[in-house]
Amino acid sequence: LLKKIHIQGFKSIKDAEIELSQLTVLIGANGAGKSNFISFFRFLQQSITGNLQNYIARSGGAEAILYYGLKATKEMSVTLTFKGSSYDARFEVTTDGSLFFTKEGAHGFTTCYKQPWDISLLGSRSNRLESGIDDDIKKFRENFKKEGITEEVKKNLSSWRVYHFHDTSDSSAMKQPVAINDNAFLHFNAGNIASFLFLLQQTEKNYYDNIVRSVRLAAPFFDNFILRKDPFGSETIRLEWKEIGSEKIFPASALSDGTLRFICLSTLLLQPSKLMPSIIIIDEPELGLHPYAITLLAGLLKKASSEKQVIVSTQSVPLVNQFLPEDLLVVAKQSSATVFNRLDISELTQWLNEYALGDLWEKNIIGGRPSK
């Protein structure tokens, strides 16, 4: 469980300490910084897995990543607090406008050896272009002679995923053929949805059947997926399906955008726990869904959060109506910087006797709406 995150100097986030729960629902006006918070997880995952320089280059350099650019911000830092361990890092600007590590550390307590550990991941260097966590895992394993405890921090950092199912165009990855064995995990854009569903159908039939039932609730015309290897010999598979009462096989392009997104969401949130990321992060999952499907989505999010940590950003009042006040994290802009606030539940008791939570958001009782 990622309990707390402290970010300084990233995009619109000047300095914020954010407490997270098993299910965290971000709400806020356009431009408040929800997407920047989501993108921070992408940044950190890339930096931990040795792709920092590529990520910075693709994002437009440090100028596009630091709070108000290079003139306003010279360094960025993060501290992540997990249950039993923590990680911190500081980044400064290179001469060519990228970022590099000037501090990186991991901290925790090994239960089996009854002793804390506190290590610098820079080793003997004063800085480095990529994370040193892999190097230190090797050293840590040598010191403690115990595989498992050594990878705790990296596992916590690298196994989360940010999902974004917005692209349902004809050229979207989820509508294209995919290698039949590309199924280790569901891709961020569901580009391997067909091969992943095929894996579940063959090896986790109960979970596969739950996904099919979920899709039928949102789309009563849906019968089942048709998941078969390309009949013309290539080792690929594509998403196909059948309608109730018909033998005709339809391609994914025959599904509405909302139905296709709901298929992706159901697959993500109803897959076996052992295949799930440690943290599931979804940007605006309600896009294109009708009101009943949004209600179903809320149930899926709650179910998934009983297994793994879930972070969601949303603009949907009907979706927010399905959650508790303690689930919400209100994102706003104050003095040109993004701030994050939890609700004071004691102040909302009377309001909640008369209104749903989303309605209070719409009325700007709990904040998170545009302000002058």
Placement of each model-derived feature along the sequence:
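C-terminal lobe/lid and adjacent interdomain/linker elements of RecA-like ASCE P-loop ATPase modules
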Residues: 1, 295-372
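N-terminal pre-Walker A segment at the start of P-loop NTPase domains
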Residues: 1-14
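Phosphate-binding P-loop
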Residues: 15-21, 272-275
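Phosphate-binding glycine-rich loops of NTP-binding sites
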Residues: 21-59, 189, 262-268, 316
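Conserved P-loop NTP-binding catalytic core
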Residues: 39-100
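Electropositive, glycine-dotted interaction segments
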Residues: 83-218, 226
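GG-anchored amphipathic helix commonly corresponding to the ABC/SMC/Rad50 NBD signature/C-loop
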Residues: 236-238, 243-247, 251-282, 292-294
